[in-house]
């Protein structure tokens, strides 16, 4: 069937496709003249069938083009298309030929190629292709691909090798070999000094076998595929290149035993581990992850450049300030080679004389040591700023937030602590919080896009397959029906059959519904079909007669049990059981009494029995099948089986290890709660749904770690041998290497490992190259792969929220439906015959009715905040009525304008007072004074509270004082302060209990929070944070639950095993008695110390301790130490043995994946999503989205830029200006900056004097050059204009700073310390930033996100303030000790120090250690005057944990949220207009309006929009019709001078592009009003001034007012009129080539309208001369009324005039350049003059000056010639006024003359096959460039008549030599635009050239 097509092509037919099928040439079945096929067969198909065959062919061939990749490689489709078209033109009959070939009728392209030689015609058609290409069907380039020049395609060896390498078992064998090779590499243990274990020696012997196998594989592939020369050969595949490389290096290592190689080349074999990735490409979810990472690479590179730039700038600043400062340290006076340490490490010093040292610097104790410059520096000398390499590494390390505080403290020691924070804090904020979070934004955007793409693609493929099948089925059915109709016309389907069909359909529908409704979660028991089961039961009962009664009873009993099992009571009973079980597990702890142990032991059995019972009951009630349908039940069953197994096992073999973990899994049963808790359920579902992506990501991560671990083993194995022993993080064995890589991946202490790695390879002199290994690991692992976790989390959470929203909507709908049904029933009951009963509305029509009204009430309450509030109508405190004078006075005071302001001032003053207190010495004079201030402040707040209570009442009625949260807080603070003062005053014994008072006084800290209520925007951010906390509660529950589960497991595993003896040689508490000797460095005798049996600070002895420890691990701080302790843990009450149980690390790895990688990211994701939703929620009322808001924001703030240009053309100033703004000058300066940067980077520590002087003089040269640049610019622009541009001001400051700096260096630095001037050297680099377009946009967005941040920052500042004050009050008096974390650098002894400490904690630097240094029992500071060990407090735990929680989870995530919000355009569809595009508009506008008048002529506006690339402008490929239509919709008003306004144009453009309330013409006024309201509500302040500019009033665009819309409507009508009317007039049978078919210079191509709709168009013999305006202004038409001299127009018979008479006035105003302002040479220019001056050529020579002037300069012109001078000169009366010439109409006169036609030369823009027969033609606008003068059109005086239609008037010739037609056209084609320089340094984007031929405007949408 189907015309004889064989079955073997069915599959191909369904899949194959090609663009060709849709091609115009109709090639679908063409097989060339030689194709086989019997043409008589056609008769065998009935005509109907033929019709279907055609349709069938179309159905089959519209398929996805990707599936025919094979075809694309074998045949170039484009060639065939062209060949087919040529064939069609040569032989018109050919196209119909194929229809008679039934054999090929239904074949798509893919089928021909499967025939190979059967289609000779195909191959012949492709020109320039190998003729033998099709025959072999092979890869590459056809038959000619001989492998290695020897084996042809048909060679049997090659055929067999090809078969082998494509044989699946061969591929698997190779993969297995690779895995085996990796295992061998992993089994090696690396020993110091190249020693080898026996195993390693044996493994080395296997090396040669692997090499052999890989060599064989490579040879086979090379034989089969060829080596490199043709497509598809061996080395054309990236994997093969890698293999080949590995084999070659293998041979080099194998046969280079005698040669000493510096590096073991076996490292390179680790690269082969990448090969299993080939398998990966088949897994869709992995593809999403991989693709999104690869796709993100482009934007990531941009960000990478920005980060690199920041690193270079900071490194150069560091080089200038800190070079060589870290080499001084304290050396002992006794032995000058011994370093005197402070604490555990040596630290830099400044001097050993206290009087000389700056504040905060480290001074050596002069009695025992001296400060000398011999030290290599901290961290083996790697951490330093001695040269640019070290400086960049150090800066990069700071950006990763690891070890940055140590560097800060060292620089403080060396230089004093006054200024260093100014360098480090911006580095952290910009580098870490901003730059690196950008990576996250980009990745999550790409991930979401990629996932959506994959999902869409899958659904599309499904749908398409379904449609194809349906289509085929439909065709077949149609044929069958036809056949049936023909044969059995009288038979019809019987009623019974019909019934059958309908029933079938119903069943299918029911099934579909059921599938759709099934719950998306498996957490609940399947509600199995009761009736179905009963049916089965009854049938079995019937059969068994005798036991009938028993079965019936059993059935009833089972039914009852099933009911009970499904009831809520049973469910809650199980939940309570789970809860008790949880409690029992949680109370277990170290050192518990025996009775508790016994009780827990028996309780375990009881719970196990109960849970087993529950399971059996359920299985009985629901039946095994239904029971096991639910995945939760399956999980339950597994847990119970595990528990039974565990109980038996522990009886048999007690003390066994690790199985107890199974017990902990029972806690997962708590998730049963999700059955009734929707949002939690959806969260769990979304977590489960993201498992797929996460598992694939984990696989990727595992591969990554594996590769780097093997690489690390090869590089650093056996090398980490230091004086202090081998560190725990090393690369000696595979498991430890994996852990080390994993640790670096989490980012914790990666810098320490790097220092050890560099030191092991020869220290900072030789081993610096090895830092690359660690940097790549951090960049790719930590910043890229781990951020994909967050991307996945953000993505899936958004899904979960959508799920919840969708479910809520469904519920609402259901309720509504029910309500409506009830309503209907009631109506039908009530509805009497007369129908007069009233309607009853039970439920308001919109489902959210009730909710909305309450929300509106709330809103109204809130809105009243702005105005003065009316007094509440209730009596206050039952005493004061609303009319009471006291209450009225209080009300008046509280609502005074400045009352709130006054309170704000008092709050700020009291905050300052709090910060100024001295926390150490409580009775210091400063504190005494501040105390009195405090009384005053408290007094003010008390008075405020009393007044408010009098005004509002206390609590009983709505709106009273204590009904608001903020007031409650105020009251608490005031009362606490009052109570503490009372204690103070009385001095009673209670007052002695200082801690009570102190804690009461600490509450004063909350005062700053009062400001939140008073600053609306701050309150909005605060509400957002609170809301996101509400949202986070769900995840918090899941989070705490998981944390709890892990804590329970940890207690089971490590309970009581974290003890150790201070003498490391003892292992038990019994042995750890007495004393031991400690040898100190440099001490002669050992020192005896007492042995102590201690527990580690972080341990797992009970659940609470375990939770705290895990929280610390999860923040990623200090966890390697905890991991080492866990792996060393042996047995309860025994000491540690290093790496005793390495498998314990699995616990931490799993924990890390679940928590930091996943849960914490979900937190971040939730906050981000909430933040974004909040932002959008504000806009919902106005019905505009975020992007639209940011664009309107931009418009409101945008102002036109002023571009300066000297007036006198011949002045020196003008010449200087020309130089300064020229492109070469810009590039020269850029080059200087780059060279200067390189010069700055060349400095290094301990450089020779000659080198130093060379650098100094070169620096002076550069300073000189920049000074010259500055002077030139000031000369060119004038002082005022120069400083208008921010960049110039910046340049000027930089230059002045550099000059002063140079002078200081030259004439000695003694007279003033100007170190900061060195900053100016680095500042020049910043100028580089304004060059690149992408960087410019990135920076712009950066600034935007800073604008969005102030309130977020304020909130963070408040958080820091409050915590710093609490820290000062509670921990301020702890003694400083270099051995703990409370040191002179890091403490709470002043407010500033406290802030620094908190900032350090926020970046996560060793916060657990600080927390442990603040707990109870710490030594006190000497000034505090307290007993020893009485300082510190256990509040420290809550204090630090809460701070870290708020900081790292909430606050810093707000940064991330803001950044992701602002930078979403990086991954958004680039065709959507965003605020970041709008800068370009302001820039280009300035070129048309240099004086920043804010207005330009509407034709210039058209030009400008055509010159701007989409999405902002129209682009120069946009057909004019479409541009007109857009302008008509934009419809800006035009003023008297026909100019449009800047703001109005920009807003109209945005509105048109983003579709902001764009409606039909009839509804436009209403839409405008709505938009005005929206703008008033969102921008109340700006709306007053700007509203009429943004949205012009109806009066401005109504009747009698001129608008852009009206002008272009006329042009559009005119155009349509010409096409219809002219099209009917035949002119000698030859179409005339229209003006528009001539090529136009690219930039102005847009300014000529294309009028061709059909390919040929006819014109009347005479066409009026084209008007030379700047862009399409209105044209004259033949029937157009002329003008008389005074503006009265006369008619010439009915023409187009009736249609467009209302726009006649425009023509009179269309302007021309000012003739009077050019010298004679310019004035006499004819229409074709070769001058490139700004006037728009051609133009009539003589003009009349009407006194209007419009002086603008376009800076994007071809010309370098002068622009008009003297913008406001009085008009000259022109002497040529009365000499009119007959070609006043500005259209070219095209007259057809037979026999004298010439063909136009071929043109790139618009190839045209039409012929042109011109006489002398006046072509305007061939070389158009933006004008500088106003256009004035001279009307024809009344006496002049239009030329009669037949008569041809010779055009005016130019006064110099005439040009031939070809010359003119050539000149026009040469009119290319050269971008001219602009003063501001921006470069116009190069316009994309138009390549594709454009045949007509009908395909408008493809152009814009």
Curated annotation (Swiss-Prot):
Binding sites annotated in the UniProt record for Ca(2+): 1489, 1491, 1493, 1495, 1500
Residues that span the membrane, as ranges: 169-187, 206-225, 238-259, 265-283, 303-322, 420-444, 569-587, 603-622, 631-649, 659-677, 697-716, 770-794, 896-914, 931-950, 963-981, 995-1013, 1033-1052, 1142-1166, 1222-1250, 1256-1275, 1284-1302, 1310-1328, 1348-1367, 1432-1456
Localization per Swiss-Prot or TrEMBL: Membrane
Record bears the keyword Secreted: no
Membrane topology: Multi-pass membrane protein
One GO MF term: high voltage-gated calcium channel activity
Sequence segments annotated as region (Phenylalkylamine binding): 1430-1471
Cytoplasmic side: 30-168, 226-237, 284-302, 445-568, 623-630, 678-696, 795-895, 951-962, 1014-1032, 1167-1221, 1276-1283, 1329-1347, 1457-1904
The keyword Cytoplasm belongs to this UniProt entry's keyword annotation: no
Per-repeat ranges for I: 155-447
Main location: membrane
UniProt feature, compositional bias: Polar residues: 1751-1762
Region described as Disordered: spans on this chain: 1-45, 513-543, 827-869, 1652-1694, 1710-1788, 1870-1904
Domain EF-hand, residue spans: 1476-1511
UniProt biased composition (Basic and acidic residues): 1682-1691
Ranges of biased composition (kind: Acidic residues): 523-536
Protein name: Voltage-dependent calcium channel type A subunit alpha-1
Gene name, Swiss-Prot/TrEMBL: CAC
């Amino acid at each position: 069937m189907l015309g004889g097509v064989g079955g073997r092509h069915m599959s191909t037919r369904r899949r194959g496709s090609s663009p060709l099928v849709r091609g115009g040439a109709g090639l679908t079945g063409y097989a060339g003249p030689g194709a086989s096929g019997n043409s008589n067969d056609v008769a065998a198909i009935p005509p109907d069938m033929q019709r279907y065959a055609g349709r069938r062919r179309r159905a089959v061939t519209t398929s996805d083009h990707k599936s025919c990749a094979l075809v694309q490689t074998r045949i170039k489709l484009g060639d065939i298309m062209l060949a087919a078209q040529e064939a069609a033109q040569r032989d018109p009959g050919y196209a119909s030929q194929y229809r008679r070939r039934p054999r090929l009728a239904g074949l798509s392209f893919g089928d021909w190629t499967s025939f190979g030689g059967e289609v000779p015609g195909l191959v012949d058609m492709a020109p320039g292709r190998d003729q033998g290409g099709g025959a072999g069907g092979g890869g590459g380039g056809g038959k000619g691909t001989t492998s290695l020049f020897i084996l042809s395609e048909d060679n049997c060896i090659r055929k067999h090798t090809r078969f082998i390498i494509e044989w699946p078992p061969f591929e698997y064998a190779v993969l297995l070999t690779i895995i085996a090779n990796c295992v061998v590499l992993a089994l090696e243990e690396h020993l110091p000094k190249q020693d080898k274990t026996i195993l390693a020696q044996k493994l080395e012997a296997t090396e040669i076998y692997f090499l052999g196998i890989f060599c064989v594989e490579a040879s086979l592939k090379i034989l089969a595929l060829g080596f490199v020369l043709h497509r598809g050969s061996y080395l054309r595949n990236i994997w093969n290149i890698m293999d080949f490389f590995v084999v070659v290096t293998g041979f080099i290592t194998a046969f280079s035993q005698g040669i000493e190689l510096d590096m073991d080349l076996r490292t390179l074999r680790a690269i082969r581990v990448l090969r299993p990735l080939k398998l990966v490409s088949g897994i869709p979810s992995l593809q999403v992850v991989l693709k999104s990472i690869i796709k993100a690479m482009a934007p990531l590179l941009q960000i990478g450049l920005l980060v690199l730039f920041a690193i270079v700038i900071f490194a150069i600043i560091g080089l200038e300030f800190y070079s060589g400062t870290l080499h001084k340290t304290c050396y002992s006076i006794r032995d000058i080679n011994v370093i005197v340490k402070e604490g555990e490490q040596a630290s830099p010093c400044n001097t050993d004389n206290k009087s000389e040292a700056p504040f905060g610097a480290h001074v050596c104790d002069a009695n025992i040591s001296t400060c000398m410059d011999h030290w290599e520096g901290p961290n083996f000398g790697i951490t330093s700023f001695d040269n640019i390499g070290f400086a960049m590494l150090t800066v990069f390390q700071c950006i990763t937030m690891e070890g940055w505080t140590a560097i800060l403290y060292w620089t403080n020691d060396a230089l004093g602590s006054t200024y260093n924070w100014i360098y480090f804090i911006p580095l952290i904020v910009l580098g870490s919080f901003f730059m690196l979070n950008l990576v996250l934004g980009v990745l999550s955007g790409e991930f979401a896009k990629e996932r959506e793409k994959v999902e869409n693609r899958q659904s599309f493929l499904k749908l398409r397959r379904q449609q194809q099948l349906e289509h085929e089925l439909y065709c077949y059915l149609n044929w069958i029906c036809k056949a049936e109709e023909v044969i059995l016309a009288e038979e019809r389907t019987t009623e019974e059959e019909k019934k059958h069909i309908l029933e079938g359909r119903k069943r299918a529908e029911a099934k579909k519904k059921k599938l759709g409704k099934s719950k998306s979660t498996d957490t609940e028991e399947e509600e199995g079909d009761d009736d179905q089961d009963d049916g089965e039961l009854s049938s079995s009962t019937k059969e068994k007669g005798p036991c009938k009664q028993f079965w019936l009873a059993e059935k009833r009993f089972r039914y009852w049990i099933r009911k009970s099992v499904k009831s809520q009571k049973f469910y809650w009973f199980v939940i309570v059981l789970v809860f008790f079980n949880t409690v029992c597990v949680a109370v277990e702890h170290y050192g518990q009494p025996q009775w508790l142990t016994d009780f827990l032991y028996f309780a375990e059995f009881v719970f196990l029995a109960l849970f087993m019972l529950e399971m059996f009951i359920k299985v009985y009630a629901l039946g095994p099948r239904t029971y096991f349908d639910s995945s939760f039940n399956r999980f339950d069953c597994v847990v119970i089986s595990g528990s039974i197994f565990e109980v038996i096992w522990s009886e048999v073999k007690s003390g066994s290890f690790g199985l107890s973990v199974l017990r902990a899994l029972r806690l997962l049963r708590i998730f049963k709660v999700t059955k009734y808790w929707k949002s939690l359920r959806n969260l769990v579902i979304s977590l489960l749904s993201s498992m797929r992506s996460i598992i694939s990501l984990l696989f990727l991560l595992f591969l990554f770690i594996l590769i780097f671990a093997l690489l690390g083993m090869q590089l650093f194995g056996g090398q980490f041998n230091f004086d202090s022993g081998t560190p725990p993080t090393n690369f000696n064995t595979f498991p430890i290497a994996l852990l080390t890589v994993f640790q670096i991946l989490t980012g914790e202490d990666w810098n320490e490992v790097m220092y050890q790695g560099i030191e092991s390879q020869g220290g900072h002199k030789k081993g610096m190259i090895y830092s690359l290994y660690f940097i790549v690991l951090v960049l790719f692992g930590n910043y890229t792969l781990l951020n994909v976790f967050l991307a996945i989390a953000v993505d899936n959470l958004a899904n979960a929220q959508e799920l919840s929203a969708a479910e809520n909507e469904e519920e609402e709908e259901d309720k509504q439906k029910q309500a409506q049904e009830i309503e209907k029933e009631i109506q039908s009951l009530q509805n009497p015959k007369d129908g007069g009963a009233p309607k009853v509305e039970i439920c308001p029509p919109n489902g959210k009715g009730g909710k909305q009204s309450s929300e509106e009430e709330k809103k109204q309450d809130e809105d009243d905040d702005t105005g003065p509030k009316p007094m509440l109508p209730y009596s206050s405190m039952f005493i004061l009525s609303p009319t009471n004078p006291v209450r009225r006075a209080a009300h008046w005071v509280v609502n005074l304008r400045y009352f709130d302001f006054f309170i704000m001032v008092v709050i700020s003053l009291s905050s300052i007072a709090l910060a100024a207190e001295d926390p150490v010495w409580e009775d210091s004079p400063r504190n005494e004074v501040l105390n009195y201030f405090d009384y005053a402040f408290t007094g003010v707040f008390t008075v405020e509270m009393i007044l408010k209570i009098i005004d509002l009442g206390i609590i009983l009625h709505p709106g009273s004082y204590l009904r608001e949260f903020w007031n409650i807080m105020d009251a608490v603070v005031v009362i606490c302060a009052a109570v503490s003062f009372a204690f103070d005053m009385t001095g009673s014994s209670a007052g002695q209990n200082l801690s009570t008072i102190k804690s009461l006084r600490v509450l004063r800290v909350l005062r700053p929070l009062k400001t939140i209520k008073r600053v609306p925007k701050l309150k909005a951010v605060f509400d957002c944070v609170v809301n996101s906390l509400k949202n986070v509660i769900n995840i918090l529950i899941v989070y705490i639950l998981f944390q709890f589960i892990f804590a329970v497991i940890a207690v089971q595993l490590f309970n009581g095993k974290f003890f150790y003896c201070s003498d490391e040689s003892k292992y038990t508490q019994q042995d750890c008695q007495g004393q031991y000797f400690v040898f100190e460095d440099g001490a002669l005798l050992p020192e005896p110390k007492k042995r102590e049996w201690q527990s580690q600070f972080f341990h797992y002895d009970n659940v609470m301790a375990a939770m705290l420890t895990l929280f610390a691990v999860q923040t990623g701080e200090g966890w390697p130490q905890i991991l080492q302790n866990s792996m060393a843990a042996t047995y309860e009450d025994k000491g540690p043995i290093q790496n005793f149980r390495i498998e314990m690390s699995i616990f931490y790895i799993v924990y890390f994946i679940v928590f930091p990688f996943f849960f914490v990211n979900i937190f971040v994701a939730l906050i981000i999503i909430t933040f974004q939703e909040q932002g959008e929620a504000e806009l919902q009322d106005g019905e505009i989205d975020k992007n639209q808001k940011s664009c309107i924001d931009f418009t409101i703030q945008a102002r036109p830029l002023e571009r300066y240009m000297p007036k006198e053309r011949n002045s020196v100033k003008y010449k200087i200006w020309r130089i300064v703004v020229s492109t070469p000058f810009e590039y020269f300066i850029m080059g200087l900056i780059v060279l200067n940067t390189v010069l700055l980077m060349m400095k290094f520590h301990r450089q020779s004097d000659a080198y130093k002087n060379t650098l100094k003089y070169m620096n002076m040269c550069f300073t000189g050059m920049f000074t010259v640049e500055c002077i030139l610019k000031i000369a060119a622009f004038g002082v005022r204009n120069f400083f208008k541009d921010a960049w110039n001001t910046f340049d000027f400051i930089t230059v002045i700073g550099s000059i002063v700096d140079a002078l200081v260096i030259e004439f000695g630095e003694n007279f003033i310390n100007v170190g900061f001037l060195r900053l100016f050297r680095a500042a020049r680099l910043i100028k580089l930033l304004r060059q690149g377009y992408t960087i410019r946009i990135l920076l712009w967005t950066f600034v935007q996100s800073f604008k969005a941040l102030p309130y977020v920052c304020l909130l963070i500042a408040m958080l820091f303030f409050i915590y710093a004050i609490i820290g000062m009050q509670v921990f301020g008096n702890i003694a400083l000790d270099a051995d703990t974390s409370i040191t002179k650098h890091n403490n709470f002894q002043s407010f500033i120090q406290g802030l620094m400490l908190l900032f350090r904690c926020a970046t996560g630097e060793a916060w657990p250690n600080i927390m442990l240094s603040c707990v109870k029992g710490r030594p006190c500071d000497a000034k505090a005057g307290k007993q020893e060990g009485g300082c510190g407090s256990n509040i420290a735990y809550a204090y630090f944990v809460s701070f870290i929680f708020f900081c790292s989870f909430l606050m810093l995530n707000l940064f991330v949220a803001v950044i992701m919000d602002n930078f979403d355009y990086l991954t958004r569809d680039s065709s959507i207009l965003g605020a970041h595009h709008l800068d370009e508009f302001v820039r280009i506008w300035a070129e048309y309006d240099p004086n920043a008048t804010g207005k330009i002529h509407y034709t210039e506006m058209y030009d400008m929009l055509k010159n701007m690339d989409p999405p902002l402008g129209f682009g120069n490929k946009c057909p004019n019709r479409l541009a007109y239509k857009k302008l008509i919709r934009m419809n800006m008003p035009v003023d008297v001078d026909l100019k449009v306004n800047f703001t109005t144009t920009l807003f109209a453009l945005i509105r048109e592009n983003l579709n902001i309330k764009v409606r039909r013409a009839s509804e436009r006024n209403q839409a405008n009003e709505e938009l005005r309201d929206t703008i008033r509500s969102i921008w109340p302040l700006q709306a007053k001034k700007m509203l009429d500019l943004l949205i012009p009033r109806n009066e401005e665009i109504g009747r009698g007012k001129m608008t852009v819309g009206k002008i272009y409507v006329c042009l559009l009508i005119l155009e349509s009129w010409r096409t219809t009317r002219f099209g009917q007039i035949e002119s000698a049978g030859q179409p005339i080539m229209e003006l528009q078919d001539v090529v136009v210079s690219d930039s102005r191509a847009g300014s000529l309208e294309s009028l061709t709709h059909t390919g040929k168009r006819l014109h009347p013999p005479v066409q009026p001369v084209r008007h030379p305006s700047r862009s399409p202004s209105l044209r004259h038409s033949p029937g157009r009324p002329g003008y008389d001299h005074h503006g009265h127009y006369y008619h010439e018979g009915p023409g187009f005039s009736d249609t467009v008479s209302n726009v006649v006035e425009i023509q009179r105003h269309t302007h021309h350049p000012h003739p009077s302002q050019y010298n004679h040479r310019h004035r006499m220019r004819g229409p074709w003059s070769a001058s490139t001056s700004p006037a728009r050529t051609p133009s009539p020579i003589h003009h009349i000056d009407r006194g209007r002037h419009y002086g603008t300069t376009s800076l994007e012109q071809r010309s370098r010639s002068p622009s008009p001078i003297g913008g406001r000169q009085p008009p000259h009366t022109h002497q040529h006024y009365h000499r009119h010439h007959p070609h006043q109409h500005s259209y070219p006169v095209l007259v057809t003359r037979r026999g004298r036609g010439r063909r136009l030369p071929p043109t790139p823009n618009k190839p045209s096959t039409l012929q042109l027969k011109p006489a002398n033609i006046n072509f305007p606008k061939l070389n158009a460039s933006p004008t500088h003068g106003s256009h004035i059109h001279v009307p024809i005086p009344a006496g002049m008549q239009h030329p009669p239609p037949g008569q041809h008037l010779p055009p005016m010739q130019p006064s110099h030599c005439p040009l031939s037609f070809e010359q003119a056209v050539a000149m026009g084609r040469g009119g290319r635009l050269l971008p001219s320089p602009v003063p501001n340094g921006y470069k116009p984007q190069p316009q994309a050239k138009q390549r594709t031929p454009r045949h007509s405007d009908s395909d408008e949408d493809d152009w814009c």
